[in-house]
Amino acid sequence: MIDRRALLASALALAACEKNASAAPAIAPTPLTSIAPFPIGTSALTGQFEDRAWVDLCLTHTSQLTPEWEMKMEYILSETGEYRWDAPDRIAEFCTTHGLRLFGTTLIWYSQDSAFFRSLDPQRFRTEYDRYIQTVAQRYRGRATGWDVVNEAVAEDGNGLRSCLWSEALGQDGYIARAFEQAKLADPDAVLFLNDYNLENLPTKGATFLRLVERLLKAGVPIGGIGTQSHLDIEIPAGQTAAFFREAARFGLPIHVSELDASLRAEARFDTRSQRQRIEQQTARVAELTSAFMDLPPAQRFAFTVWGLRDTDSWLRRDARDDGKDSPLLFDAAGRANPMFGAVAEAIRAG
């Protein structure tokens, strides 16, 4: 996965600039919240709250917000161990004001730790690890309906678990179990998720992830839900996404499609497919994902979150390789529904 840390550096400024963009009026499609029997979510940066068009689109089509970056450790915890609450609190207040669910991400992630932990002795490390999780989760207790407690624990290729600062100090299963235990103490009512990516795209990784879930549950770890980011590769075989969802459903846990997008970018140098052909692949894969989610028992459909509203809000559009033409989300820059929106809506209606 591309490192989103570098890409997010300019995101807040970009969001603020977009509020001044002019766009032709669009015919508004039926709001997804009016047809979906589950919460529809999106990601948010506080700069987007100043963009009236973004706010209107958000309040029309979504019922849940996930902070894109400003509730991660890299933002909250300084190198000296001080906590910063301005942006996370503002997102929580926005949700309260507008009647949206708040979903927190992420308490522990290999990619965005804090330099604060790197100089600690083992005992202090454990103490501060517990303190961080409890401090953040307790602050939003009663407001956050759920948390990505641990994000991206499985190795990139799916062969085993990822080595990171947390696993080196607390063990590969140990840091995960400890994080869930501390989060449960901090907020017993929140749904606690193990979240990862490429679970549909790479069957090996999906299988490793589900074995991890099974192992932790057998050990008594209080995992309350399964999160699949669903950054979909539009070229995966038909049926592969549905197969993963069938396997994941066997635990009976709530499942969160937590970061959906589907890039149209041609990765192969000599890819000769037309844009229309790529859109057909995209909508087919997104429709399959939505149908697989709809096939879950109602109690297991936690939420369906798209990682951004407009194409220009996407982290993929902040990538240096972006040509300004990728369309990975439900709406274009002007807030008009993309074909991907229709794929989601039609799959929901089909039940």
Regions found by a protein language model. Give the residues of each.
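N-terminal secretory signal peptides and thylakoid transit peptides that target proteins
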Residues: M1-K19
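C-terminal segment of N-terminal export signals and the immediately downstream linker at the start
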Residues: K19-S43
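Conserved, mostly hydrophobic/aromatic
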Residues: L65, C95, W147, I226, ...
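N-terminal substrate-binding region of glycoside hydrolase catalytic domains
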Residues: S34-D89, F94, R101, T106-L120
